[in-house]
Amino acid sequence: MHKLMWIIVWMGAAGLPLRAQVAPGAAAPGGAVPAYFIDGYHGGIYGHIPPWQTRFMVDKLHQYPDWKINLEIEPESWDTIARKYPADYDAFTGVLADPAMSDRVEYVNPTYAQSYLYNISGESIIRQFYYGMRKLREHFPGITFSTYSSEEPCFTSALPQLLLSYGFSYASLKNPNTCWGGYTRAFGGELVYWTGPDGSRLVTVPRYAVESLKPKSTWETIASNNSVAYITRSLKAGIRHPVGMCLQDAGWAGGPWVKPGKDHIPGTPGETNDIGTPYMPTVYETWKGYIEKRSIRVPGQVWHFTQEDVLVSLVWGGQVLQRIAQQVRVSENKIIATEKLAAMATIYSGAPWPGDPLDQAWRTLLLSQHHDCWIVPYNERSGVTWADNVVRWTGNTNRICDSVADAAMGVLSGAGGASDSVLVCVFNTTAVERAECVSFSLPNGWHSAEVLDSKGRRVPCQPGDSTQWLFLAHVPSMGYATYYAKRGFHPAPVAEAAGITRQQDGTYRIETDMYSLVVDPAKGGTIQNLVAKKLHHKEFAGVKCLGELRGNFYEQGGFHTSTETPADVRILENGPLRVRLEIRGRIAATPFAELLTLTEGQKRIDVHLDLDWAANTGIGASPDSVRGYPLKKAFYNDSFKLQALFPLSFQTPEVYKNAPFDVLHSHLSNTFFDSWDSIKNVVLLNWVDETDAKGAYGLGLFSDHTTSYAHGENYPLGLTIQYSGGGLFGRDYTIREATRLDYALVPHAGTWDKAGLWTEATLWNEPLRTRVFEGGAAAPARSLLHIDTAGWEISSLTYPGKDLDVRIFNAEGAAGPHRVYPGFAFRSVQLVSLAGRTIRALTPKKDVQGRTYLLLAMPRFGVRTLQFNEPFKQIDE
């Protein structure tokens, strides 16, 4: 990301000689202890890289024999450089291939698009590394990857196991010169064992406990220039080999970042406060060289690094960022489900694996996860903004996925036959068997349908909206089931039909087999009562109503709430399988519409929200409240933003929230801050959960996009809906269109893991799919994979070459060992790393019914990949 021009003051004249190398730990000739520095470049063709950058790096490496660089250049950049500047490209590849240069250049961030990582799915993180490393090896065949480091706060708690599985040995948690979007918590000394949620640990250079944020700055720490203050504080804290860092923006023309000067004299008055003078002597290193040759090598501390140690903030609720997050989430969900369907089609029907189209779909999804899309969405080049690119990139991913998925379902379903009936195939891309309400479009001329399962038994049905027809489907894990629909309407009975009634006091009561719920139009259509019938009739609503919209409309008199104006309520569907209630109200003169959906047997209560803004209006903290305070930003404090609030009946509640391949028990007393130097991690990736102090009951809140949540003492659980006001770099985040989003509520007993909350979120993100054919024939039901325990998730299915790779994530289950049942034959199977290295072969076993299974154990939050060699359909099918 482009820094502001005043940063150039640190860039002195080029061409001066650098400090000669000093032996590890030895004093320089003048007696000063040497410090170390990580220099290099950050950027790429999508971020910023000028035509001369490649040749510039080569020339400067030759000009300064003691200079070393660490690279964070977008891998796809090398395609363009090779095509447009072949001589420069050849010169650079020559440098990397030169044994004499092998310790002077290290590629420290090979991800495809330099994503923040904390804001995307775990599987997306895996593919960021996979595709990025693959691209770099196309250009630099002998390249190795030892250390992960980033100039931006591109960190997430689960990285240790992923990095180790890809063959990395080290990491750095510093980003001293680009902290606009945040930083990691200051902790520890020279080296720590960064310990992830699964127990994996990685040798890591942290942001030291003494590495403070730079005074009067909103983007730096005192390590960005190896300041005298930073190094002397580090030495006094017992850090024997202190190291600073700055990966310069590609395009900065100053060459080596820290310029030579006089050696520091220990004990100089004011040395611990001198943040402007670079410490001397400073020795340049790569991260690998520093850790292996300069540092203490063996960490003295173990750090159980959590997601709340990633102190980051973006303009959550800003409409442009909200749309980007939604578009990315849609594409993430689509591509994972599409790969699974394609794998089924390849194994069961012999369809070719669509590797090239899926690679292209992943490419554009990964680009849409670029950190600049999220932090500077309005920045543009040739009239095209990052936000515009996300629309284009995710659109491409979605088109490819829709085409591949449709083809796969078509191959699996079969076609042809009589036209007086239709074949309805229902596909499940998750690891659990499902019994859910699904819908399909009635054929032309049909007004109703009778649906039968593969054994000819009628199943419960219901008319949906328009030409949609609903029925209750039972589908095996990672597979599909077949149903037949005929003209007519003779539905099977429902044991406890869902329904809505309007009561004498004007409220609406919704009854399903799961819930009894009351909506009050007089209070803006909010939920007054929420009783979970199968949870000992627990009442979840507190004294105040659930689902109230509230925010500070600072141009319209301050705080407003949706309860100020009565709502119009209309019943859209009234059972027996599904009920839908439309709620239309107003907040601060802006009309909104909510669609409340409850389904028989479904734990989740779905809410779709539309806000039809007539014009841009300020929402959030008033600009006047932060004017004159450079560290303060109006978008930091979520309590002023428009939120959906859920005051529950719990006393002293606890909060849990998920992250990529992780769930965190929050230790925040509240989520509120208003200044750059006090950032908290309040990111809601997929869900946040509030439970009572005893862990007896809880309410999960799901979001259709990465955003923020609110919570605190005397402040209810809240979902950020909208912000309109000043953002980063002085940009105004405005409202330009209607706001449309989905969220869901899941009341539950026990803590999040006992309630299977991660699994519920996966079911929401990967809904059952239907494919309809007139007539036709197909196997009644198939299951490609089944796991004999709850809480294990199939993160992905891919079919590179002749092998099927099955990635499994232990989201909320026991460590095992557990049984994994493949629904296909295979030659052999092994456990492999993300890098493709065989860890060990697995021995198939048979259960008492003669079914093949594999035993697999992994810790909570562990990720494992099974590779099935030459899988094929069972011979007896």
Segment roles from a protein language model:
Residues 29-47, 188-418, 427-429, 454, ...:
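Active-site and substrate-binding clefts of carbohydrate-active enzymes
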